[in-house]
């Protein structure tokens, strides 16, 4: 005959069961930060989304929002990047390959299909983004790197130590698009995020006007945005760290700072501190 369970034993069993339930219920919530799509944020509570509620304070993963290096408020991307502002950046030389390729309409089309870029963005961050675009493309003059094919032929931009992103024969992974996406691993990761096989067809970035901006948005939200909370200088290091090492490249970093200050002026916002890298 089984020994009757005492009141103390029943209480201990209830307490142990309660602790077990708390632990097992809380784990799935915490683990949700691995389940969001690449262009969605995981909130501090473990849910996916693209607004400030998800990408703001406490954001655990994804394209989390920063304070913009100075806490300036979020603005409407469409209302801030007007045709006049956009066109003021364009290089108006008649021989520019990018003339007619980079347009305000295609910029907005790309932003609408990649909502996490502009869902909660500040004027200062907009100025920072376009400062890097201006430097990388010559004020949106160049669609692809001038000497890119020659560099690709010599084996540059193909990192063989990343076998998960194999370089396709006859393909070059040199700079293309609004922020000059480079290297096989970036083409691979970006292509996966955008559902495009960019490892097999990297040239698509220089052929598709919307994709040329979407790759820039991907690079920005994945590699640059979180650095911006430390000031513009940190974004220079994130985009091209070689420009922070002195020598001739220092002039290019100075250009980025100048453009950033100029665009902040156009948008009526202070550039903040920590401009250099």
Curated annotation (Swiss-Prot):
Q: What are the alphabetically sorted keywords of the record?
A: Carbohydrate metabolism, Chitin degradation, Chitin-binding, Disulfide bond, Glycoprotein, Glycosidase, Hydrolase, Plant defense, Polysaccharide degradation, Signal
Annotated region Catalytic: the residues are 75-277
Record has Lipid metabolism as a keyword: no
In its UniProt record, which GO terms are filed under biological process?
cell wall macromolecule catabolic process; chitin catabolic process; leaf senescence; polysaccharide catabolic process; response to amitrole; response to silver ion; response to virus; systemic acquired resistance
> Single GO cellular component annotation?
apoplast
Domain Chitin-binding type-1 stretches: 32-66
What reaction does this enzyme carry out catalytically? Random endo-hydrolysis of N-acetyl-beta-D-glucosaminide (1->4)-beta-linkages in chitin and chitodextrins
Give the superkingdom in one word.
Eukaryota
Name of this chain's protein: Endochitinase CHI
Q: Which organism is it from?
A: Arabidopsis thaliana
From which lineage does this chain's organism come?
A: Eukaryota, Viridiplantae, Streptophyta, Embryophyta, Tracheophyta
Which gene is the coding source of this polypeptide chain?
A: CHI
């Amino acid at each position: 005959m089984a020994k009757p369970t005492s009141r103390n034993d029943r209480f201990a069993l209830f307490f142990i069961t309660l602790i077990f339930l708390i632990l097992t219920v809380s784990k799935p919530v915490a683990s949700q930060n691995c389940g969001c799509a690449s262009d969605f944020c995981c909130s501090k509570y473990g849910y996916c989304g693209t607004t400030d509620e998800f990408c703001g304070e406490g954001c655990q993963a994804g394209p989390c929002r920063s304070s913009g290096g100075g806490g300036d408020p979020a603005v409407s991307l469409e209302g801030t990047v007007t045709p006049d502002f956009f066109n003021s950046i364009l290089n108006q030389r008649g021989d520019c390959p990018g003339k007619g390729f980079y347009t305000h309409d295609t910029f907005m089309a790309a932003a609408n299909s990649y909502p996490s870029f502009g869902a909660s963005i500040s004027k200062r961050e907009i100025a920072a983004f376009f400062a890097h675009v201006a430097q990388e493309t010559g004020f949106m003059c160049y669609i692809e790197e001038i000497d890119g094919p020659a560099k690709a032929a010599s084996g540059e931009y193909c990192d063989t130590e990343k076998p998960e992103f194999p370089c396709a024969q006859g393909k070059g992974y040199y700079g293309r698009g609004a922020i000059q996406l480079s290297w096989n691993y970036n083409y691979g990761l970006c292509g996966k995020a955008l559902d495009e096989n960019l490892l097999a067809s990297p040239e698509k970035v220089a052929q598709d006007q919307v994709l040329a901006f979407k790759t820039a948005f991907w690079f920005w939200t994945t590699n640059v945005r979180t650095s911006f909370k430390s000031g513009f200088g940190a974004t220079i290091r994130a985009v091209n760290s070689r420009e922070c090492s002195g020598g001739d490249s220092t002039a290019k970093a100075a250009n980025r700072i100048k453009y950033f200050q100029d665009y902040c002026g156009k948008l009526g916002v202070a550039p903040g501190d920590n401009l250099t890298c």
